Amino acid sequence: MKRSLRLSMLGAATLLTASSAAACTIFSVVRDGHVLVGNNEDFTRPGIVWFVPSSPHRLGRVNVGFDKSLAEGSMNEKGLCFDSTALPKVPWRGDVLKQRPKNLLDKIMDECGTVAEAVEYFRKFDCPPLGDAQFLFADASGASAVIAWLPDKGLSIVERQGDHQIVTNTRLEASGYRCPRFAKAEQVLAARHDASVETMTAVLAAIHQRGPGGFTSYSTVYDLPARKVYLYNLADFSRVHEFDLTAELGKGAHTLEMATLFPGGATLADVTAGEQRAEFSTRIDLPPEVLERYAGEYRPDIAPEVVTRIERDGNSLRVKNSGQPDATLYPETETTFRIAPDRGTVSFRVSAEGIVEGLTLHKGRDVYATRVAVP
């Protein structure tokens, strides 16, 4: 137990992020009456977009993905939108009393117009894909929620707090760990105060991937009230193809390969050449006096015999444990630090009076520690 906790406090476990090939990012932004959803679809194949007109028992919609048998993302004519991210696989338990549709996501997009209705379908029906995927749903009113599955809880529904919601490839309720792409998206949104296509693409550009191990195949921005889709291919944000959903549905069912929409644009050879882009600069500078206030000794609440010492080291913090290698923490916000290079995050608990009371290590789970001494 003691050694395990020391290793946890040093962030010595393996990375929690998904592989580059499946590391996607979704976010919704609600500001000044605008409701937008952005997505980077990171994979190793070119994308397609297809339109499905309405019928007496089905809402019309636009789908994006790689195979018409499975939509990775979608928006229907009511302004309900979803996209998905891959997750580390966990045991999923079905409910024998619940029906299991062939494809619950299709059923929701065919029949629902709001996030509340979508969430109710997840409560009503079984959804086996939740074992290794999660879904962000958003609607034209601005509501959004992330639906996932936790082995110790079951269905996890996290609604938007504040003016945006972000999800990458970790379960939000499993721990407070957020990957560098998540942190970078937060930083870009904090620096820009509007909800515009330009702001959405600024986020997407900051967190896109490229390289032989996986790349951003396509990116989408959905304007839910306007029922419009802005499509970008292979992380080339200088070229956009805009779709009006109502107009496209009026053309009947049709499918488009994304590459054909961007003649002369980026190619697969362009985005797979060179080194893999998998790191995102999230480090910020903090004044020395802010860093100094976190120095001291901390003891994990579940094992108070373990002592972790933290001291300022230039523009970072250094973590010391007897008999273990030192670890470096670099700041991403005034109270949140990443264990370099990305072995977890640490958030410091600061009282309203500015007193540092403890910290929380965020990894596969959250480990709380109390500050017991100052320098």
Which role fits each region the language model picked out?
Residues M1-M9:
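Bacterial N-terminal signal peptides that target proteins for export
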Residues C24, A71, I355-L359:
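A broad structural signal for short, well-ordered beta-strand segments within beta-sheet-rich domains
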Residues A18-S19:
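N-terminal signal peptide c-region/cleavage motif recognized by signal peptidases
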